């Protein structure tokens, strides 16, 4: 007697979920949006994952039609509710717009709340850029060396007082600041955006009007030390401020 073939709805669901994740990963890779979610050093792992899912999808597609013994009715041994979390993740990923961490979360996460000195003595901090920065006529803060320069300014401010500096970040108004002060901030991502921490530096300007919370600026000025919350902190006395669009890669990543 010929075997009866029936649709296996569990296999169909698994195939749809795998296809959804493949499309999502390829889309994130092709549009270069992975850095909105993870550190670029992990991008290759997700690219490999996308290719690994393809043969898994092929294997599932081969099981969509299954032979059933004549005396047995087809039935599923698993609960289809177990697929719900994967379906929800896919729906949210495709339905919700990409969201970049902004100034609204800085107060919650704490500006400069976890610096190198929080876990080691200042004299133990690695200073790979110290000589270069001291000799440079202008300190240019780039995405690549952002965290190292911020650590230098945070813990060795005296080495750089009155040096000229230029950097880009978004505006955050810190509690306890004066009407002429704001912080210029970037989010530092170690692994993924869930562990992102805001790092920045205080800035002083003649007139803060027009510099809205979360606005991206490129600033130039001279490094100084100012009192803030009963301690001396690094600050930039601004000489030039330029409004800029949000960068395509808004986060910075510490060196490996």
Model-derived segments and their meaning:
Residues 11-74, 78:
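Membrane-embedded alpha-helical segments of integral membrane proteins
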Residues 49, 206-219:
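Short nucleic-acid-contacting surface segments enriched for D/E, G, S/T with interspersed K/R
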Residues 75-101:
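Internal/C-terminal transmembrane anchor helices
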Residues 99-161, 166-167:
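Membrane-interface segments at or immediately adjacent to transmembrane helices
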Residues 165-171, 214-224:
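OB-fold and OB-like beta-barrel modules that bind single-stranded nucleic acids
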Residues 178-189, 232-235:
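Short aromatic-glycine-enriched beta-strand elements
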Residues 196-209:
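Beta-strand/loop nucleic-acid-binding surfaces
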Residues 228-252:
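OB-fold/S1-family single-stranded nucleic acid-binding modules
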């Amino acid at each position: 007697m010929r075997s009866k073939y029936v649709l296996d709805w569990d296999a169909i669901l698994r195939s749809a979920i795998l296809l959804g994740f493949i499309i999502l990963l390829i889309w994130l890779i092709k549009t270069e949006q992975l850095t909105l979610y993870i550190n670029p050093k992990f991008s290759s792992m997700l690219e490999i994952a996308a290719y690994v899912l393809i043969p898994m999808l092929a294997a599932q597609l081969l099981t969509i039609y299954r032979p059933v013994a004549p005396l047995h009715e087809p039935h599923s041994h698993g609960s289809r509710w177990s697929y719900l979390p994967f379906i929800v993740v896919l729906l949210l990923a495709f339905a919700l717009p990409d969201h970049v961490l902004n100034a609204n979360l800085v107060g919650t996460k704490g500006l400069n709340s976890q610096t190198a000195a929080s876990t080691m003595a200042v004299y133990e901090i690695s200073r790979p850029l110290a000589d270069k920065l001291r000799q440079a006529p202008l300190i240019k803060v780039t995405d690549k060396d952002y965290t190292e320069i911020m650590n230098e300014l945070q813990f060795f401010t005296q080495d750089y007082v009155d040096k000229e500096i230029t950097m880009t970040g978004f505006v955050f108004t810190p509690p306890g600041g004066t009407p002429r002060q704001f912080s210029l901030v970037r989010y530092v991502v170690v692994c993924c955006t869930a562990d992102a921490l805001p790092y920045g530096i205080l800035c002083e300007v003649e007139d803060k009007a027009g510099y809205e919370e979360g606005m991206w600026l490129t600033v130039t000025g001279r490094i100084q030390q100012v009192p803030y919350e009963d301690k001396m902190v690094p600050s930039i006395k601004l000489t030039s401020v330029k409004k800029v669009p949000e960068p395509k890669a808004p986060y910075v990543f510490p060196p490996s």
